[in-house]
Amino acid sequence: CGISPHTDMNPILLKPTNDKSSQVVLNGKPVGNMSAKDYFGIQNQKEELFKEAIEAFKRLEARYNPIVLEGAGSISELNLRDRDITNMRMAIAAGASTYLVADIDRGGVFGSVYGTIALLRPEERVLMKGVIINKFRGDASLFEEGRSLLKELTGIPVVGVIPWFRDIKIEEEDSVALDMKNNTYKDGKINVAIILLKRMSNFTDFDVLEMDPRFNPYYTNNID
């Protein structure tokens, strides 16, 4: 959209430091480490963070229209719902029209969409305006019956089917994607070995090498 990135677009960043805690970066500045117990526990430090997120949204709202809010993970995690500040709670605070994006490439899209919507609270469900089917391989017209079935099951229309694209490079959201990265040395290429550490941040800096045919970046546990 031609707008320079700003910390208001990602006011709360968590960078894992070990299996039980993360560094908290607030409005672009580190403010300390927080354990999962502190983050999700009785003290619920997320309340203060949520206030900061609201203020960041208000600053963006004053400058731009429309604003796209991207959720994180499932919107129907029952055990986390009362403490989740990234999905429906933020949507309610912003009065945002909400669209559920479902990855059909993983399989089980009908159960996933139906179950997710069925578990929403009434005040959350009223915000739902449509379902978007992502990563569809083949002829999208073959999913017409699927669109009708999902509308019948959920009462919410499928507003779009996005095909699988092989020629676009979008940064991965988190390190879970590293499991699918290339891990093979190739002859005739400039090989770049990237050591798979337990916790990696900024690994998307290597994406540019993947787009250059001269290079073969590969991820490995071998430090020899």
Question: Residue locations for each model-derived region?
Answer:
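Flexible phosphate-sensing "switch/lid" loops adjacent to ATP/NTP-binding sites
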Residues: 1-224
